[in-house]
Amino acid sequence: LHSRDLRRLLDLCHAHQAEIGLHVSHEAGRKPERIPAEKAALEAVLGQPVTRSRHHFLALREPEHMLALEAAGITDDYTMGYADQAGFRLGTARPVRCIHPATRSLSPTLTLHPLTLMECTLSAARYMHLDEPAALRLALALADEVRRAAGSLTLLWHNTSATPHSGYLKTLYSRLLLLLAQGA
């Protein structure tokens, strides 16, 4: 968290008013009690509160993680998606309040945002294994479903997908953003 390159990236994010959230570690995925310490470390580097999160590997245990996120002051989580299938894990394209399984009551503070699409879901042989044209068609179809539902389009594109070794994912991302900006 203290490298010069990361500091430059954080400065760039700040200059463009990007919101930075906590990427809950694999370790905290096994031990939710680690979430507050990870959040505090990120806040110390940023010098500002962190209220958003997503779990590594989309790994989320209920209700332990939900309770830990709430206790840590996280208000918005973006983990609700499947790695092996694009679409709406929550059955909706709209953000929803977390429901506590034990009490069946709505969380007063934690909102779950459906993850619409993760790039490796499209391309990886162990998941959907789509070619570029099929991946673009699916991404645009999902974006259209989100638009019709007045939902929230959440895309997860890993930084490694912007490298020359990522197959079609870098160009897909650029094309998808351009088409979405044009109203596709």
Residue ranges and their predicted role:
Residues 12, 16, 41-45, 68-74, ...:
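Alpha-helical structural signal in soluble globular domains
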Residues 25, 113-118, 157-160:
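Short loop/turn segments at strand-loop or loop-helix junctions that form parts
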Residues 18-20, 118-123, 156:
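Short acidic (Asp/Glu) and glycine-rich catalytic loops that position anionic groups and cofactors
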Residues 31-37, 62-68, 88-93, 165-174:
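Histidine/acidic-residue-rich catalytic or RNA/ligand-binding cores of hydrolases
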Residues 1-60, 64, 159:
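Metal-dependent polysaccharide deacetylase catalytic core of the NodB/CE4 family, i.e.
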Residues 43-146:
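Active-site-adjacent pocket scaffolds in enzyme catalytic domains
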Residues 13-15, 136-184:
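C-terminal domain-boundary segment and adjacent tail
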